[in-house]
């Protein structure tokens, strides 16, 4: 029978999936042919029924016989199909089901992707305005404005897109000569220590100790400059030359006094650190501590300020407090917005 032979062909195990598709298509076509034959038989039976109605009862027996024959033929075909299906192995059924499942999955995936592509809107680049075209006629894209810093302590924002300079350094300019004093140069002092690391690390301290007599020279020079300024200010006849000399002396006095003040501050910081280290060594030697405690820079500065304030006289304290008050007020004014500056 043709159906049984085709089903037996489908039962054979094949490696490639194209054979399964071919067999499935053939079986579908066979099923459609069977359906068409059944429809034709039903149509014929209907037609015969109509003829019997028209002709009378003489054709009724013939139509009944034809119906019985068609029913018996269809029952035989169904029994053949069921018997052939019972002979199919489970491996062939599993392979056929797997091939059909893969094809169905792939079709659903492609359909989903196509629907998503249809739904997703196409992003078109923003068209530049007329103002931007007038401002940047030759540029393809206008430069983006960088956002401002959150605070003055934040790092500066710089774009990574910047034009490379067209200039090229062919000959490097000579280095600017710097005046160096070998008495206070750290390189010279490190070489003169003969490889002693304890002395080499504290080269500046040893230099200050060796040339401590220069401080007395500076104080004498400062006193002479102040006397010279006082005599020029007391003179009645003042010309342009004297005024220029007075301004020069004032600048020199302020620079020398500031330099001496920094020397004193650094010396006081060294004394504070030396005293703290001495105390820590004694505490470790006595067994009160197992490890030393190192002061931070902020703690050292705070200790220096307290010492200087205790050593000042009454007038010096008032002057220092007034300077501090002005400094804090100017700092607050800088941080204040412009609208409040005008009101206050």
Swiss-Prot record:
Its main location: nucleus. It comes from the Eukaryota. InterPro entries: RRP36 (IPR009292). Residues 215-267 form a coiled coil. GO terms for biological process: maturation of SSU-rRNA from tricistronic rRNA transcript (SSU-rRNA, 5.8S rRNA, LSU-rRNA). Residues 33-54, 61-70 have a biased composition (Acidic residues). The keyword Ribonucleoprotein applies. GO terms for cellular component: 90S preribosome; nucleolus. Residues 311-321, 329-344 have a biased composition (Basic and acidic residues). Pfam families: RRP36 (PF06102). Disulfide bonds: none annotated. It is found in: Nucleus, Nucleolus. Residues 71-83 have a biased composition (Low complexity). Residues 15-83, 95-167, 311-344 are annotated as: Disordered. Keywords: Coiled coil, Nucleus, Ribonucleoprotein, Ribosome biogenesis, rRNA processing. Component of the 90S pre-ribosome involved in the maturation of rRNAs. Required for early cleavages of the pre-RNAs in the 40S ribosomal subunit maturation pathway. Associates with 90S and pre-40S pre-ribosomal particles. Belongs to the RRP36 family. PANTHER family: RIBOSOMAL RNA PROCESSING PROTEIN 36 HOMOLOG. This is rRNA biogenesis protein RRP36.
């Amino acid at each position: 029978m043709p159906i049984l032979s085709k089903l037996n062909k489908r039962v054979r195990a094949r490696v490639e999936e194209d054979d399964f598709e071919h067999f499935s298509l053939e079986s579908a076509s066979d099923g459609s042919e069977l359906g068409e034959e059944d429809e034709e038989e039903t149509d014929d039976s209907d037609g015969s029924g109509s003829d019997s109605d028209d002709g009378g009862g003489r054709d009724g027996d013939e139509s009944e016989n034809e119906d019985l024959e068609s029913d018996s033929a269809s029952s035989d075909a169904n029994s053949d199909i069921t018997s052939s299906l019972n002979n199919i192995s489970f491996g062939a059924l599993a392979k056929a089901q797997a091939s059909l499942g893969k094809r169905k999955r792939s079709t659903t995936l492609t359909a989903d992707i196509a629907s998503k592509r249809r739904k997703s809107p196409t992003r078109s680049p923003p068209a530049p305005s007329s103002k931007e075209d007038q401002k940047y006629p030759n540029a393809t894209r206008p430069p983006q404005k960088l956002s401002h810093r959150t605070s003055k302590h934040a790092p500066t924002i710089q774009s990574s897109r910047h034009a490379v300079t067209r200039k090229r350094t062919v000959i490097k300019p000579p280095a600017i000569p710097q005046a160096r004093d070998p008495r206070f140069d750290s390189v010279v002092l490190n070489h003169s220590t003969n490889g002693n690391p304890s002395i080499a690390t504290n080269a500046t301290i040893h230099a200050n100790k060796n040339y401590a007599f220069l401080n007395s020279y500076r104080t004498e020079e400062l006193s002479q400059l102040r006397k010279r300024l006082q005599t020029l200010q007391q003179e009645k006849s003042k010309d342009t030359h004297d005024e220029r000399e007075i301004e020069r002396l004032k600048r020199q006095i302020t620079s020398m006094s500031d330099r001496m003040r920094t020397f004193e501050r650094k010396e006081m910081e060294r004394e504070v650190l030396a005293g703290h280290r001495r105390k820590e060594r004694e505490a470790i030697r006595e067994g009160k501590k197992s490890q030393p405690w190192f002061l931070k820079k902020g703690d050292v500065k705070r200790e220096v300020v307290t010492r200087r304030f205790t050593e000042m006289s009454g007038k010096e304290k008032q002057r220092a407090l007034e300077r501090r008050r002005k400094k804090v007020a100017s700092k607050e004014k800088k941080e204040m917005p412009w609208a409040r500056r005008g009101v206050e």
